[in-house]
């Protein structure tokens, strides 16, 4: 009887944690909005509640509310709590370093993008995606009345937030790619980053390999929001209509936005854009392995649902990637796993 009660208690606790799972995301969002990690980091040592209060963006501060949020952040193991000279002080646990501004692995943009009210809205339409009413609309379209691409073009402030979030993710990926896959760029003199956003990814390549002429290629409203890095060229266009020629075409987190038919169309255009002698397409995307015990497995499965809801796309297993590349008329591929959520697929058209 005692064992059954313990099992019930554990099961109920698990369900309650699922029910309130959103709390972790939104408490994290509030910590970012209040700039708590940067305040403590800039102070140089753990801070008391009253010290933290004095540095918040507006006064007066509800210290009881702040205390309770900090208590939750400590339980999340993002912040630390210690007693120094008889006073309770709050510091930063290791994961909180990714909340500190000013370094290439800062994740603030990604946090604010993913927890934005509009970007969370499609998750409320997951049921409708399963009980298909004959509609081809994505959950994003059901929630916000338009597809994600038109929404971004019509809401420049959200587009900027989205681009900042993607740039955060890109910096994490490209840091690993450049360090762990440098031989991938041997023999390449030109590369085009298709759907490359504001140019963060290809700029990392330009810095690491100055001899490579790097170009970012994306929609006009995306290029318009680009900082205009001097190391790279920018071209506006639509990948379904034209892809500029280069020794290598790179696509980071692009194909997961689309269904198989559209991916094959994109891959065929990429094939036409690279030379027969040594040309290749570099795909940076997730490879699903549901049996894996990797720390990123749950996140990869979450991103698969995210793609389904927002774009109608999907994350793919290696077998699905193999079929996609074969159906696009490519001769072969090579997979390299890197220290990131994504892996690298070198697809060889000829």
Curated annotation (Swiss-Prot):
Positions annotated as active site in the UniProt record: 256 (proton acceptor)
Molecular function terms from GO: (RS)-norcoclaurine 6-O-methyltransferase activity; O-methyltransferase activity; protein dimerization activity
Enzyme class: transferase
Pfam families: Dimerisation, Methyltransf_2
Transmembrane segments: none
Modes of activity regulation: Inhibited by sanguinarine.
Keywords carried by this UniProt record: Alkaloid metabolism, Methyltransferase, S-adenosyl-L-methionine, Transferase
Tissue-wise expression: Expressed in leaf primordia of rhizomes and root endodermis.
Gene Ontology biological process terms in this record: alkaloid metabolic process; methylation
E.C. code: 2.1.1.128
InterPro entries: COMT-like, O_MeTrfase_dom, Plant_O-MeTrfase_dimerisation, SAM-dependent_MTases_sf, WH-like_DNA-bd_sf, WH_DNA-bd_sf
Residues the record lists as binding substrate: 169, 253-257, 306
Amino acids binding S-adenosyl-L-methionine: 166, 170, 195, 218, 238-239, 252
Keyword field contains Methyltransferase: yes
Keyword Secreted among UniProt keywords: no
Catalyses which reaction(s): (S)-norcoclaurine + S-adenosyl-L-methionine = (S)-coclaurine + S-adenosyl-L-homocysteine + H(+); norcoclaurine + S-adenosyl-L-methionine = coclaurine + S-adenosyl-L-homocysteine + H(+)
Subunit structure of this chain's protein: Homodimer.
Chain's role: Involved in the biosynthesis of coclaurine, a precursor of benzylisoquinoline alkaloids. Catalyzes the transfer of the S-methyl group of S-adenosyl-L-methionine (AdoMet) to the 6-hydroxyl group of norcoclaurine to form coclaurine.
Family, per entry: Belongs to the class I-like SAM-binding methyltransferase superfamily. Cation-independent O-methyltransferase family. COMT subfamily.
Name recorded for this polypeptide: (RS)-norcoclaurine 6-O-methyltransferase
Organism: Thalictrum flavum subsp. glaucum (Yellow meadow rue)
Lineage: Eukaryota, Viridiplantae, Streptophyta, Embryophyta, Tracheophyta
């Amino acid at each position: 009887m005692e064992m059954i009660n313990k099992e019930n208690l554990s099961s109920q606790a698990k369900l309650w944690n699922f029910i309130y799972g959103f709390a972790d995301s939104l408490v994290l969002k509030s910590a970012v909005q209040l700039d708590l990690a940067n305040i403590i980091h800039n102070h140089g040592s753990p801070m008391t509640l009253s010290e933290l209060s004095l540095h918040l963006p507006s006064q007066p501060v509800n210290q009881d509310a702040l205390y309770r949020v900090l208590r939750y952040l400590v339980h999340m193991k993002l912040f630390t709590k210690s007693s120094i000279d008889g006073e309770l002080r709050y510091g930063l646990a290791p994961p909180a370093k990714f909340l500190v501004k000013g370094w290439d692995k800062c994740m603030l943009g990604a946090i604010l993008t993913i927890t934005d009210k509009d970007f969370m809205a499609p998750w409320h339409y997951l049921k409708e995606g399963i009980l298909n009413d004959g509609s081809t609309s994505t959950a994003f379209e059901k929630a916000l009345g338009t597809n994600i691409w038109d929404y971004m073009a019509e809401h420049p402030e959200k587009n900027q937030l989205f681009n900042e979030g993607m740039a955060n993710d890109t910096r994490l990926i490209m840091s690993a790619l450049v360090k762990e896959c440098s031989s991938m760029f041997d023999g390449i003199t030109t590369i085009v980053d298709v759907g490359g956003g504001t140019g963060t990814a290809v700029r990392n390549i330009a810095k690491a390999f100055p001899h490579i002429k790097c170009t970012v290629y994306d929609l006009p409203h995306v290029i318009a929001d680009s900082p205009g890095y001097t190391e790279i060229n920018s071209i506006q266009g639509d990948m379904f209509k034209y892809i500029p020629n280069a020794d290598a075409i790179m696509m980071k987190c692009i194909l997961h936005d689309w269904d198989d038919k559209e991916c094959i169309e994109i891959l065929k255009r990429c094939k036409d854009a690279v030379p027969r002698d040594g040309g290749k397409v570099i795909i940076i995307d997730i490879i699903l392995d549901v049996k894996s015990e990797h720390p990123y497995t749950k996140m990869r499965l979450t991103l698969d649902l995210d793609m389904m809801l927002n774009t109608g796309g999907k994350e793919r297993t290696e077998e699905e990637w193999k079929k996609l590349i074969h159906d696009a008329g490519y001769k072969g591929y090579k997979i390299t796993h890197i220290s990131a959520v994504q892996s690298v697929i070198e697809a060889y058209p000829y």
